[in-house]
Design a protein with these regions (language model features):
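Short terminal alpha-helical segments
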Residues: 2-47
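A composition-driven signal for long, intrinsically disordered, charge-rich low-complexity tracts
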Residues: 5-14, 61-64, 85, 103
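Short interaction-prone segments
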Residues: 12, 61, 70, 75-86
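Intrinsic-disorder-associated interaction segments
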Residues: 12, 16, 31, 51, ...
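Exposed alpha-helical structural elements
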Residues: 22, 34-37, 57, 76, ...
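Amphipathic alpha-helical interaction modules
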Residues: 34-73
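Amphipathic alpha-helical binding modules
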Residues: 78-116
């Protein structure tokens, strides 16, 4: 379950700043087909923030999509994440599901560390 970014590998795009505009631009460059979902979630997060008088929904939204970009800017990591998600969903037993879920966590950690 060794997860790493190969030495000398370059991301497809630079990691965006943690702002809605920068993250949206990265999402558009990485996969324009998810922009409708991004926009819908942004609208929901801002409405929730307004209703709750809290910045937390917006902060969670930005963090989620920032991490999405952190993974997808490395195509091999993104492919491995999709495969682990499939393995977890189709696991025949709890141990297989846990192993796939643990690998998902490691992929997210590696991507976040590389983006920091």
């Amino acid at each position: 379950m060794e997860v790493s970014i190969p030495v000398g590998a370059q991301p497809v795009v630079a990691q965006p700043e943690r702002t809605p505009v920068a993250v949206r631009a990265a999402v558009a460059r990485l996969d324009v087909t998810v922009l409708p979902r991004f926009e819908a979630e942004w609208t929901a997060a801002t409405a929730q923030a307004r209703d709750e008088y809290s910045v937390m929904p917006v902060r969670h939204f930005i963090e989620k999509w920032w991490l999405w970009a952190a993974v997808r800017r490395w195509p091999d990591l993104a492919a491995r994440l999709r495969e682990c998600g499939r393995r977890s969903a189709e696991a025949a037993d709890l141990m297989d599901a846990r192993a796939a879920s643990a690998e998902i966590g490691e992929i997210l950690r590696v991507a976040a560390d590389a983006a920091a």
